């Protein structure tokens, strides 16, 4: 995504205001940095977005905040189990209903997570690529729509 887009972006201001409120209340940041607002605005407007940002550039917020603003479950697919664990832990400490499913997740915990998904009490689910592949192999429950996805 370029810093200066040649395409007009029509994002309702109330959507970005809500996103800024979530940013302040949940993550403790005063405002977005760099291209975060533009990327989040695109996602909130229902469009695809590609953000190539440096390490520490705030990529995670670009998919976490839309998942918290929009209804439904946010699904993040990642091959990095340690990063998933760190992000889920941080989100949980901030009061976000987040969980992860990876090759280390026990059967009982997996069942609890699927029940939370079914009840609609989970905001974000981090899923390892291996667990995603295994879910298709064994016919695990399908994640209900609507779903906001990250790391795509």
Where are the language model's segments positioned?
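ASCE RecA-like P-loop NTPase motor cores
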Residues: 2-9, 41, 89, 93, ...
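Conserved pre-motif I regulatory segment
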Residues: 7-54
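Conserved nucleic-acid-binding Ia/Ib motif block in the N-terminal RecA-like helicase ATPase lobe
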Residues: 20, 74-76, 81-134
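Short hydrophobic/charged patches on amphipathic alpha-helices used for structural packing
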Residues: 40, 64, 111-114, 138
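Short, high-confidence coil segments that cap the C-terminus of an alpha-helix
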Residues: 46-49, 71, 122, 146
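Walker A/P-loop
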Residues: 46-65, 75-78
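Conserved catalytic network of the ASCE P-loop NTPase/AAA+ motor domain
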Residues: 67-69, 91-93, 115-120, 140-146
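SF2 helicase catalytic motif II
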Residues: 123, 130, 137-152
């Amino acid at each position: 995504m370029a810093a200066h887009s040649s395409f007009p972006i029509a994002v309702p201001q109330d959507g970005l205001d809500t996103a800024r409120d979530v940013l302040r209340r949940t993550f403790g940041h005063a405002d977005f940095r760099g291209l975060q607002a533009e990327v989040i605005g695109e996602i909130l407007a229902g469009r695809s977005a590609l953000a190539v940002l440096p390490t520490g550039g705030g990529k995670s917020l670009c998919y976490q905040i839309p998942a918290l603003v929009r209804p439904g479950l946010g699904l993040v697919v990642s091959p990095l189990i340690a990063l998933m664990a760190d992000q889920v832990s941080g989100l949980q400490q901030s009061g976000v209903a987040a969980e992860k499913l990876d090759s280390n997740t026990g059967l009982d915990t997996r069942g609890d997570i699927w029940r939370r998904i079914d009840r609609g009490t989970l905001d974000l689910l981090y899923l390892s690529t291996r667990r995603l592949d295994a879910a298709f192999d064994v016919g695990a429950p399908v994640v209900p729509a609507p779903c906001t996805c990250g790391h795509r």
